[in-house]
């Protein structure tokens, strides 16, 4: 095998390892969605109240993303990844032995700390270790890893939780994380910090209105999604009257939609980035608006969830790629801010979903999310029209 092909194969394996790391981080972030009812029963709580686990996790990431990124900005990336995985594993061990809900929240905050740095560096890191001329495909591979978290992580986590308890689910995640950490130690090269940015980058980024409005759009649109998604399990069971096994199958469909979104992103995004985002947001709003109606038949719900998953997955990929293009001189800092704001959206969405469930009823979460999605859509369109020339320059 020619040396350049051998080197490219090794690089591809490294990208795959990072995709597996993304899988495990995304699995643990969202697996509580599939186990809210079981966790609530364990601690004798209301399901809506245990949904605040998502809020605490997300807001920990929001608060810590930028300061943690600045504190670790000059660290060699391989050693930083290893330290993050150690924190991640310790957090899951604490989750397994949590003797009350507050200890579980503390464990989730520990995991969220590792998350805050991991997702700040991962996108730019994957671009660095990927083969030449395959940067977009590498980001797509990372996206597939995160999508598989929904396909495999959430349904399997739910099944394990139902059979032997939610604590075992967190224990299995810890074991998988340990395995991935050993692969990182063995296969990843030393990676000095590069174009990470520093605290001096903040005033420069603040002078880029297109980037700032992109952050605002991200917060609102992600809030719209998680207003409904956080409570999708109790919605399907209590409102849709689905058997719990069908609820697991719906989560599986959502995950497969993430892979479809990754393929669409790889093929279509580069040709018309703005149109791609507009269509993706439209799919999200359409799905949330019709969520309640989809409970009439199983086929309707499966179809709607698939479309919903494509919409939100394409939005996440597109906005992250846009951030990287708008801040090539400070990728890690810009991505850290994006990660924090993304998780602010998750936390806000979980909170809005909780409020909608408490004061309006569980059946109203789709309408609440759709209203938020419309606000985000209007902001994005308005921003695009105002900074049209900047959009065109950034995509030349």
Curated annotation (Swiss-Prot):
- Name listed for the protein in its UniProt record: Probable sugar efflux transporter
Q: Where located? A: Cell inner membrane
* A GO MF term: carbohydrate transmembrane transporter activity
Does the entry annotate any disulfide bonds, and if so which pairs?
Answer: none
Keywords, ordered alphabetically: Cell inner membrane, Cell membrane, Membrane, Sugar transport, Transmembrane, Transmembrane helix, Transport
Source organism (scientific name): Haemophilus influenzae (strain PittGG)
> How does the record classify its membrane topology?
Multi-pass membrane protein
Q: Where the protein is mainly located, per its record?
A: membrane
Regarding protein family, the annotation reads:
Belongs to the major facilitator superfamily. SotB (TC 2.A.1.2) family.
CDD domains in the record, alphabetically?
MFS_NepI_like (cd17324)
A GO cellular component term found in this entry reads: plasma membrane
Q: Which Gene3D superfamilies does this one have? A: MFS general substrate transporter like domains
Q: What's this chain's function?
A: Involved in the efflux of sugars. The physiological role may be the reduction of the intracellular concentration of toxic sugars or sugar metabolites.
Give me the segments passing through the membrane: 15-35, 51-71, 84-104, 109-129, 137-157, 168-188, 209-229, 245-265, 276-296, 297-317, 333-353, 365-385
